[in-house]
Amino acid sequence: MSYQPSLWPVSVKAVALDHQSRVLLLHNERQEWELPGGRLEIGPPSGSNPADHSLEETVERELREETGWAVKAGTLLDTWIYEPLPGRRVLIVTYDCTVLTPNTPPAVSHEHSRAELFAEHEVPRLTMPDGYKRSIAAVYAARKKR
């Protein structure tokens, strides 16, 4: 019997704040809010998309595609395992990202029903995975120390 490693998708997400320090969140098909970002592309032969060379490259590309925002990946915030559906696990990686286009309204891709900007005090009441809330709280805490 040969060894077959578990293969989980890796989703790289951004905590991105606009010029008013509001965090950008996207509303998904599960009726949850989530951080923008997406899957690490492994490239051919598994698909037609070119491979991402780093997690930072992934999050920067995904933000452009999903929201139209240009960002620069900064500090790695967290990694955690999320099970959006029974038996389906995803490795989530979150980054603190600097928005290079902070005055640009976010676009909404076909993957989400809407995009909204939330103030820090609004985040705890939102329906979203706790891992995202931890990452958002970490960014706000770090920025208060600056």
Model-derived segments and their meaning:
Residues 14, 76, 95-97:
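A structural signal for short, well-ordered beta-strand segments
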Residues 96, 106-139:
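NUDIX/MutT-family hydrolases
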Residues 16-17, 25, 97-99, 117:
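Conserved hydrophobic "DFG−1" position in protein kinase catalytic cores
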Residues 9, 80-104, 116, 139, ...:
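Active-site-adjacent beta-strand/loop module that shapes the phosphate/pyrophosphate-binding cleft
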Residues 1-23, 79:
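Conserved N-terminal beta-strand and adjoining loop/helix that marks the start
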Residues 69-79:
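A short coil-to-beta-strand element that immediately follows conserved catalytic motifs
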Residues 18-65:
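Conserved Nudix-box catalytic region and its N-terminal flanking loop in Nudix hydrolases
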